[in-house]
C-alpha cells in the first residue's frame, strides 16, 4: 500500500485555518480526507472517528497541542487511523493535521520520520501556514511561534487580505520572504484557496528543485561580498542525531532594511565548485549535532566531485537525509545551492565550513 500523503496545516491564533479546512472538507473535490484536529481547551470527542455526511473521517483530540509534548498522542492517532483504514472500517485518501495557533510545527513534522510505523504508513507532503494579513506584523514582532510557523512552511496562504491595503500586503510579503524565501505566497480570502494550494505540494520530496524568492537572492547578494548567496531549505528522512524540536528561531539578517528584525531568518550558500562528499558529510553531521534544534528547514541541490548526478539533501532539525537526483545536463552549469532557515544560526561558521568542503 502506498504511504498516505499528509499535510500539516498551521498558522497563528485566528489566522483562518479552521475556515479554510472546513471549506476543504465540504468541497466537492472527490477526495476522502481524514482530519486530525486539535481543539485545545474545548470539549471534543477524544480519539473518536466522526463521519460527516461528506464522507471524510475526522479524529479530534483534546489532550493539548499537537506538538512535541503530546507527540505520543499524534502517533497513536495516526496509527489508529491507519489500522482502521487497513481493516476497511474507514476509508480515506490523505490526512490533514490542523495544529493549534501556538503549536510549533517542527515536532509534528519530525513524527513522520522518527516513528517507524508512522513512516511506513504516511508520507509528509508539506507544511502549509496560514498568515493573517491584518495582524501578522504584530504577531511576528511579539511571538516566536508565529515566526517558526512561517519558517517551516512549504506554502504560505495570506488570509484577510481584504482588510489591508496593497502596500501593507507587499510589506508583509517582503518580510515573510526574508524569513522563508523558499515558500511561495498566495492569498486566501475567507478560506477560498483552491485545494491545490494545500494538497500535493511535495514539499518534503527529495527532488532537485530549489526555488527561492529572487528579491531575497538579489538583496542577499548585495549584502555579502563572497560569491555565494544564502537561502533556506526542506527535508527528508534519515536520522543524523535524533532531536527534539526547536523552540528557538534564527537571528535576523535584515536583507530588506525593514524596521523588523526577526529572530528566524534564512541564508543561502552557492558555489560552482564541487563538494568533497566525505568532508561535506562530516561537516553537515557536526553542524546538525550542534545546531540541530535551531535549524528549522534546510535543503540543497549539490554538485559532488566525480559524480555525474545531482545530490539532493534536506532536513528538519536533527533529521537529515539525502538522495541522488537527475543527471547533470551536458550544457548545464554544475554548481551547488543550499538554503538554511533557522534561529540564531552562525551563518559565517556555516559558510566558512562549507567552503572548506569544496574541492
Where do the PLM segments sit?
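Short, hinge-like loop/turn segments at secondary-structure boundaries
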Residues: 51-54, 146, 202-205
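C-terminal accessory "lid"/substrate-recognition subdomains
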Residues: 155, 164-329, 333, 343-359
